[in-house]
């Protein structure tokens, strides 16, 4: 027998923690480092994404150029107006090397902290480039995406041709309506649009059916009207690996697009998302129900030149 050095209670030595504490006192005084498993006094614990770490492991996490998958810094919103789009671009087959990621960060963050890099377990030998949320205008005029993509190509990375990569676009929910009800109505029209024009969107995305089924599946819900489509999506039980991912609290994520390192294709994708959001916000359910793909394509304005050209290349003008 021995005594707990904290509360004085008698305990069997084999039941003691660290040879001196009862289990209750140990639980109140110590935590276990998520990374290395060492015991850490609560006064010395460092937290990252609400997980406990010892000082050494915490320093390693924060010093790394390629962050872990769960890394989520506070978002920095760039550009005036709405919506804001957060980009996740996966690149592969060039190595998950901090030196390579640093080269990309030096280009993207020359003016401001625009992007960061993360580990992604779905990739074979690469990482994910993630942007802070920004307006389409800011993405176009200020974040040097062409230089970022060119640098990735120069280092030997692939995105479209790897077969593993996606280009995901997060839309901030707050931009989709002033009230929760308005936001839900806008989201319903986006879901309905994807269901109604699935074949067209799949061609636009450059994904194969197999890739879409695995990473960005269709809900296959009712197309009677947008509200029924949203209801079907929410009760589908499909989780986050859907073309329109609704599981995030503050964003709607469009996951359907295949990764790309071609600047014009990248910008055409952002312009497509921006146009869809604009129409979903401003049109009624009835207008969405009667709209044809040709009518949608005809609304592409001159300032979305990359989208106009891309629709022509993909045979999606009608």
Spans of model-derived segments:
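C-terminal accessory/tail domains of diverse enzymes
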Residues: 58-161, 174-318
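Short metal-binding segments enriched for Cys and/or His
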Residues: 29-32, 36, 59-64
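Short Cys/His-rich "knuckle" micro-motifs
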Residues: 14-17, 32, 43-46, 64-65
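Flanking scaffold residues of small Cys/His-coordinated metal-binding clusters
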Residues: 1-2, 16-17, 27-30, 48-49
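Zinc-coordinating Cys/His ligand positions in small cysteine/histidine-rich zinc-finger domains
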Residues: 12, 22-30, 41-42, 51-57
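Short, conserved phosphate-binding/catalytic loop or strand-edge motifs used
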Residues: 165-171
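Short cysteine-rich clusters marking metal-coordination/redox-active sites
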Residues: 4-7, 22, 33-36, 54
